[in-house]
């Protein structure tokens, strides 16, 4: 049977309570509320003091019993007179503390009864059943760094490169679906990335037919990954759904697939072309660095910057013609051009002496079709003009 007596004394103010006309209702409610809060604070303070006193008494009793036990262990037979007196003192203290403990517990029990009989109010009418809620939420995934992604891709390729290439060579929908069913670990971003790189490599190697075959499987994998993102599921859980959809798709869906395939092949061709051009630039720069003369100038660039009459001298490999041409030029201009020829290695001073001495100093062949092994003698120092035109380093 339900006991409804607990509802008989509820101390809750009601705006509809009747009050005397000469009494301000709002002030009366405010006074009642303040008095109720003060009573609750006083009761809470009394409860805390009793609880603190009870815990302190228990602590002292436990400490006294511990000392008494240590004394009994140290002097099991009762010990000397001093030890016996200490034991009696501790026993008396323990007895007194037990009596105090019972008093504290009695006061606590009276306080609990008092609390139980107190009328309910807006503060005590209900209590929290729990103070927190726990939800099973998916842990936030930390974004991988570029180094982690690269290492993950490298490890995956080392383990499954043969299987990825086998998938890339398939063509029929049923064959692709069956192979992925047997190897579901291939349905991932790493497989798609490897196929993209493979397509570019094949285009660079001018294997266009094979590139188009692998490109088809690349788009298949990318469509599966996009479907997984849209459905917010693991790609391995939806690749069968993709094949079911693609095999029964309408003309518009197939056109979308084919358009994406053609656009991808164009991007592959563009990337392959850019890679080839970059490789050619690197090769040309490497060759240019090899050609640089002792002064850090490129002989090709220097030759092309020479006046036509000087270019003819290098083309003909005629030292006398070179001397005559320099003698007719302005000394400052002649010195400028010849110094550039020396810095680029196009002209090597004392070439004959260096060759006879077994040195490495030999004139570089000029880039006008002349033999690169040819050696040029230094211009004779007979005239001031020729000496100035030689432009010694």
From Swiss-Prot:
Its Gene Ontology molecular function terms? heat shock protein binding; protein kinase binding; protein-folding chaperone binding; unfolded protein binding
* Comp. bias intervals (Basic and acidic residues): 378-393
Span list, region Disordered = 352-393
| Keywords, ordered alphabetically | Chaperone, Cytoplasm
Gene Ontology cellular-component terms listed:
cytoplasm
- State where composition is biased (Gly residues): 356-368
Q: What's a single GO BP term from this record?
A: protein folding
InterPro entries the UniProt entry points to: Cdc37, Cdc37_C, Cdc37_Hsp90-bd, Cdc37_Hsp90-bd_sf, Cdc37_N_dom
The residues the entry assigns to the signal sequence are none
Gene3D superfamilies given in the database record: 6.10.140.250, Cdc37, Hsp90 binding domain (1.20.58.610)
Main localisation: cytoplasm
Q: What does this protein do?
A: Co-chaperone that binds to numerous kinases and promotes their interaction with the Hsp90 complex, resulting in stabilization and promotion of their activity.
Q: What subunit structure does UniProt give? A: Forms a complex with Hsp90.
What family does this chain come from, according to its entry?
Belongs to the CDC37 family.
What is the protein named?
Hsp90 co-chaperone Cdc37
Origin species: Gallus gallus
């Amino acid at each position: 049977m339900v006991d409804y007596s607990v509802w008989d004394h509820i101390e809750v103010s009601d705006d509809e309570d009747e009050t005397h006309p000469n009494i301000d209702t709002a002030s009366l409610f405010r006074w009642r509320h303040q008095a109720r809060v003060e009573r609750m604070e006083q009761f809470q303070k009394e409860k805390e003091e009793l609880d603190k006193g009870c815990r302190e008494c228990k602590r002292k009793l436990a400490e006294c019993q511990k000392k008494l036990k240590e004394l009994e262990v140290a002097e099991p037979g009762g010990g000397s007179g001093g030890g016996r007196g200490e034991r009696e003192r501790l026993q008396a203290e323990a007895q007194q503390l037990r009596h105090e403990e019972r008093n504290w517990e009695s006061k606590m029990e009276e306080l609990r009864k008092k609390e139980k009989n107190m009328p309910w109010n807006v503060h005590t009418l209900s209590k929290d059943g729990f103070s927190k809620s726990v939800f099973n939420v998916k842990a936030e995934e930390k974004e991988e760094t570029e180094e982690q992604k690269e290492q993950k891709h490298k490890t995956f390729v080392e383990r499954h490169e043969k299987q990825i290439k086998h998938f890339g060579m398939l063509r029929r929908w049923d064959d692709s679906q069956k192979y992925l069913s047997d190897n579901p670990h291939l349905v991932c971003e790493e497989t798609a990335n490897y196929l993209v790189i493979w397509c570019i490599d094949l285009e660079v190697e001018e294997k266009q037919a094979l590139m188009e075959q692998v490109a088809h499987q690349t788009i298949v994998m990318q469509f599966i990954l996009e479907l997984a993102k849209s459905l917010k599921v693991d790609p391995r859980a939806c690749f069968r759904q993709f094949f079911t959809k693609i095999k029964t798709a309408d003309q518009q869906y197939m056109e979308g697939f084919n358009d994406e395939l053609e656009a991808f092949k164009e991007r592959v061709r563009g990337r392959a072309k850019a890679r080839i051009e970059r490789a050619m630039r690197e090769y040309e720069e490497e060759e240019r660095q090899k050609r640089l003369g002792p002064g850090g100038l490129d002989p090709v660039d220097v030759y092309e910057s020479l006046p036509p009459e000087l270019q003819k001298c290098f083309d003909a490999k005629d030292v006398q013609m070179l001397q005559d041409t320099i003698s007719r030029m302005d000394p400052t201009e002649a010195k400028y051009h010849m110094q550039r020829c020396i810095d680029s290695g196009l002209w090597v001073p004392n070439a004959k002496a260096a060759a006879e001495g077994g040195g490495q100093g030999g004139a570089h062949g000029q880039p006008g079709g002349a033999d690169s092994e040819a050696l040029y003698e230094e211009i004779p120092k007979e005239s001031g003009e020729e000496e100035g035109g030689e432009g010694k380093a």
